[in-house]
Structure formats: C-alpha cells, structure tokens
Amino acid sequence: DVAAKTGFVNIHLLVSPEDPEHISEIKRILKRLQFHALSDRFDCTREELIKLGKLTDTSIVDDVAALRHGATQFKVNFDQLRKVIHESDWAKKNILIAVAGNAGDGTSGVRQAADATLRQEIEKFAHIVFSSSPAQREFWLGQRSGLTPEDLRIRYGGCKPCLHGSDSHDQKSVGQPVDKRFSWIKGALEFDALRQACIDPEGRAYVGEMPPRSALPSQVISHVKISDADWAC
C-alpha cells in the first residue's frame, strides 16, 4: 500500500515449485493477508477477491471479471506482508521477494523525504530488483561512486540482482523487453538458479540482448607465480 509515481509499489512473490504442495502452501500464506475496506475485512483468497470486486463495481456479475477487478482493489500493507513472510519457515525457504525498481510502480517512484526510510525498508526486504536499467544494476552491485558493496550490506542487506520485470500488460510485449534487455541467469532451468543469483548477483545475473561471452574479471586468473619448482621452467 505504498504509493509510487503513478500507482502503488509492486512487490512480487516468486514461489519455488520444488515442493509438491507449493500451491496449497502459498494459498495458506496469501490467506493471512487482509484488506480492510467498505466496513469489512477481505482475505486474499479467490472467494474474497470476487466479493470485493462485485462490491466495488456493482455492474460486474461474472466471477472472473470480479476476481480481476477485486485483485486490483486489494492493497497489501507492507508491514503485514513482511510479518507474514517472517513468521513462516516455509515462506522463507521457498519464496523470493522481488520489488519493481522503476518510478511508475516501483521504489524509484517513492520520492518524498518522509518516505525515504520506508523505501529503504522495502528494498532491504527484497531479494531481487525488477529493473533492466544499467544504472540500477550498477547501484545494486555497489559499482556506483560513493556506494560500495559493504554499504549495500549495511543499508539493504547486501547486493541484489537486477532482472527485467515479469509483468506483461499486453500480449505483444511478452518476450519483447524494451531495448532487448533480456534477463540471463547462470545455472540450470530451476528455481535454485535464482537463489544462487541472489547470493552472487554480479556473477550469475545479467540483463542485455545476449549473455556475457567471456568470463567475468573476478573469475579470470591474471597471473600465476610458482616458487621452488624447476620443473615448471
């Protein structure tokens, strides 16, 4: 429920499919999120979202349309979301948090000085930043002037991978990121590759038209010194 420039800050829950019961488990987590409106309380469930949709737009009679509308009306309190995630061992093991980094519906749009601390708390809570901006990637890797990886660790819990946002608002934009800024993750096609990217964002996450062709500088041996080894001459 934190306002950005043209909407509210979008926070995404990326759920690991490794647990066979992950769908029922995430439903349990979402059910704990509540929205108070219209002198009532609504839980984040299909039934409650349909009810919310029909109450906020009485012209809607179709359940699918009501679900869609209700989902746009339902606003999650940040402190409540953080509490729900932190209180669940399953959530901490199986959910990665991604936050939009742009101005429209991301943390870059939280510009008021009074909200600076809240913005920092949201970004600290997130594992991943949804942004394809080169400037944002440099920032979250600690490569910008005046901000080191150690500074990021203290203020935000560490460096974070930047990936192109997963939202698509129309069919034409599916698989067609702006300026061909595709997301590349080093690893197998499994959720654990995302976890590894959060641990090593510089080496395992990249945004661009093509993945890096050569090894990263940090993974290249620049010189070798061998002492007391005549056989190496």
List each language-model region with its residue ranges.
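Charged catalytic cores and adjacent phosphate/nucleic-acid-binding surfaces used
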Residues: 1-32, 102-233
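Active-site gating loops and adjacent loop-to-helix segments of metal-dependent hydrolytic enzymes
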Residues: 10-64
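Generic secondary-structure transition motif, activating predominantly at the C-termini of alpha-helices
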Residues: 34-37, 53, 68, 89, ...
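Hydrophobic, aromatic-enriched interface-forming segments
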Residues: 49-115
